[in-house]
Regions:
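Glycine- and acidic
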Residues: 18, 166-169
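Substrate-binding/active-site clefts of carbohydrate-active enzymes
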Residues: 2-13, 19-32, 36-44, 50-162, ...
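Conserved beta-strand positions in the central sheet of alpha/beta enzyme cores
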Residues: 47, 100, 169-174
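Hydrophobic "anchor" residues on beta-strands that sit immediately upstream
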Residues: 98, 167, 196
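A structural motif
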Residues: 43, 165-167, 213-215
């Protein structure tokens, strides 16, 4: 655990919600109608899987994966509007629960906002094409965190969302430099004191495989320094 982790988090119950599948309507407004039940189950923290627009290029299936994000600063219109999202978070807070959202900072969809505006911020293969380190993830391209301008953009984005939500669940956190997460945590704290940071770590064999390819990947014993 990070040096400043709130020990009360050890006793908190986190309930993960995939907005698309949680209700028949698959919207923020419809999810509000189920919050009392989730509270009754003992949930303390509602973790929303990615709420952002999904890319079209290379999409898996008809609907696409929510982890192939097209715009980190946007809201998936299938779920509702930004105002609907804020209304949902307010409703979660009104019931004494907290809300965290998924952030997917290892990769974006191939047709993402960043792919169009900053193609230099991405990992490229030997042919100079935007690519990925995990072959099966063909609906995404990996970001390259050797670019400090990318750090600034991502941290500013986290600070933007931290004005609304209580924390973040960080997808494939192991593949994003630990120094980035440490810097992000420090800056976000100025916006959301006590912000919750939950990391997805990966199996040791996955770490080893990526490192053999020359890619960055942190172990559990490294990640704990930046996450709760």
């Amino acid at each position: 655990m990070a040096e400043h982790t709130d020990q009360n988090l050890l006793h908190q119950v986190i309930y993960s919600v995939f907005v698309r599948n949680h209700t028949k309507e698959g919207t923020f407004r419809a999810l509000e109608g189920d919050l009392d039940r989730l509270k009754g189950l003992g949930a303390d923290i509602i973790w929303l899987m990615p709420i952002h627009p999904i890319g079209s290029e290379g999409r898996k299936g008809t609907l696409g994966s929510p982890y192939a994000i097209q715009d980190y600063r946007g809201i998936n219109p299938e779920y509702g509007t930004r105002e609907d999202f804020i209304h949902l978070v307010d409703a979660i807070h009104a019931r004494g629960m907290k809300c965290i959202i998924d952030v997917v900072y290892n990769h974006t969809s191939p047709d993402s906002v960043l792919a169009h505006t900053h193609p230099e911020w991405f990992f490229h293969d030997e042919q100079g094409r935007p690519s990925r380190h995990v072959a099966d993830w063909w609906d995404v391209v990996d970001l390259d965190y050797t670019h400090k301008e990318l750090w600034r953009y991502q941290i500013d984005t986290l600070k933007m969302w931290a004005e609304i939500v209580d924390g973040f669940r960080c997808d494939v956190a192991s593949s994003v430099p630990l120094d980035f997460w440490t810097a992000a945590r420090q800056e976000v704290e100025t916006v959301r004191p006590g912000c919750i940071w939950l990391a997805e770590s990966v199996h040791g064999l996955h770490v080893l495989g990526l490192r053999k390819m020359g890619a960055y990947c942190a172990t559990d014993t490294e990640l704990y320094r930046a996450f709760d």
